[in-house]
């Protein structure tokens, strides 16, 4: 039975690596996958899911205007699809999360979404909010704070390494712009 999955975490927990491994597992069994990533995330090149450990795969791009149900249905007419994988799922819109639930419910294709739960101000991203609400299965991917505790928050750092408290929710940057930390160190650094 197809399901909508949401694998969420903070930065540097291996979301893209896990996505790429899942896609490979399907392909190794001669099953077709369709991989998506956000058009606004071009850190490692446009139309590519890339892991920090160096593996990558070409991907379809989604924009705020993309109708994912229609796109996936069109791909399905060209070849059978066994799994849809979405990287940077925090950038999905509410409507796109609904469209992915329709892929699961009407097209009977499992959809695996990978993304951040919250931003640097500990606020939910739109895509994450609706995936947390509508996914059939939620799984947290874990990483650790510099103190060794589980990291579940992310700090945004400026070019001097100072913590940024205000600003736009979405700022595409590499690992040097963000730091995953535990709640204790998040509160200390943000000074709420």
Swiss-Prot record:
The entry's keywords: ATP-binding, Cytoplasm, DNA synthesis, Kinase, Metal-binding, Nucleotide-binding, Transferase, Zinc
Protein localization: Cytoplasm
One Gene Ontology CC term in the entry: cytosol
Annotated binding of Zn(2+), by residue: 145, 147, 182, 185
InterPro entries according to UniProt: P-loop_NTPase (IPR027417), Thymidine_kinase (IPR001267), Thymidine_kinase_CS (IPR020633)
Example GO biological process: DNA biosynthetic process
Catalytic activity, as annotated: thymidine + ATP = dTMP + ADP + H(+)
Domain of life according to the entry: Bacteria
Annotated catalytic residues: 88
Alphabetized GO MF terms: ATP binding; thymidine kinase activity; zinc ion binding
EC number in record: 2.7.1.21
SUPFAM superfamilies, A to Z: Glucocorticoid receptor-like (DNA-binding domain), P-loop containing nucleoside triphosphate hydrolases
Residue sites binding ATP per the record: 9-16, 87-90
Family, similarity comment: Belongs to the thymidine kinase family.
NCBIfam families linked: PRK04296.1-5
Subunit structure of this chain's protein: Homotetramer.
Protein name: Thymidine kinase
């Amino acid at each position: 039975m197809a399901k909508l999955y949401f694998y969420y975490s903070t930065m540097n927990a291996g979301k893209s690596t896990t996505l790429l491994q899942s896609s490979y597992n399907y392909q190794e069994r001669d099953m077709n996958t369709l991989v998506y990533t956000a058009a606004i995330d071009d850190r490692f090149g446009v139309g590519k899911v890339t892991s920090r450990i160096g593996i990558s795969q070409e991907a379809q791009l989604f924009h705020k205007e993309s109708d994912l149900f229609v796109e996936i249905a069109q791909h399905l007419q060209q070849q059978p699809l066994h799994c849809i994988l979405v990287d940077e799922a925090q950038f999905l819109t509410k409507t796109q999360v609904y469209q992915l639930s329709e892929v699961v419910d009407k097209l009977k294709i499992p959809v695996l979404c990978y993304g951040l739960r919250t931003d640097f101000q500990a606020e939910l991203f739109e895509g994450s909010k609706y995936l947390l609400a509508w996914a059939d299965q939620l799984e947290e991917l874990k990483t650790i704070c510099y103190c060794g505790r589980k990291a579940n928050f992310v700090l945004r750092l400026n070019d001097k390494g100072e913590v940024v408290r205000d600003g736009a929710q979405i700022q595409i940057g590499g690992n040097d712009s963000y730091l995953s930390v535990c709640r204790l160190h998040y509160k200390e650094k943000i000074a709420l």
